[in-house]
Amino acid sequence: MTKQFNSNGRILFEGKSNIDNKDIVVIITGLDNKTSNKKTGDMLQTWILLRDHAPNTSHKNGLNKSVCGSCPHMGNRQNSCYVKWFQAPLQVWKSYKNNRYDYFKKSDLNLIKGRSLRLGSAGDPTVIDLKVWKPLLDVCKNHTGYTHQWRSNFAQQYKGIVQASCDSFQDYLLASGLGFKCFYVKHKDTKIDKKLFINCPASIEMGQKTECSICSLCSGSKRDIVINAHGSTAKYVALEV
């Protein structure tokens, strides 16, 4: 009997994490079905997960370091991570463990053409080598991506590809000094020099003028972006003076 794969996703990568050499997997989804995230719009999603550990429990007990690295929101630190690890990441991982996804083939690049791509819907895109993403980046319409690993040597190849995730103005100064374009998440009352940044056009404070799939400013090579912390995790972002 022929195995029935879930055609909405593919296994993009199986191998070792750049962070600690642990086994990880990267799954791409949205190949059949459009996504409905209000902020991002219709984008292909990529899930960077531990191969053999459920993502929700891995997040709670700190095992997610293999895919999240030094992200300050990794682990059970006040639950400040915006990713709902018990929702889509867990479902994707379960499908993977149940052998529901086929491997990504060269011919599947036709499914990427003209689509918007989100590098790291969960997990940090720099934990795998850029050469894995490159074929997709070469054919997609546009992409977004963010990394908290911008201090790490392995992440330097991603300059011009992803934004450095910055949790303070000091982070911004350091990351931009290394050559990264930045995505700075700040307390709503933290004052900034408006000449340095563009406010995220998809943010609540900017009236959600567009979607990430249309905007594509967060592609690592355009501008430094700032956004007010929002949602249930905003209370964990400190006011800077």
Indicate where each model-derived feature is located.
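Class I S-adenosyl-L-methionine
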Residues: 1-241
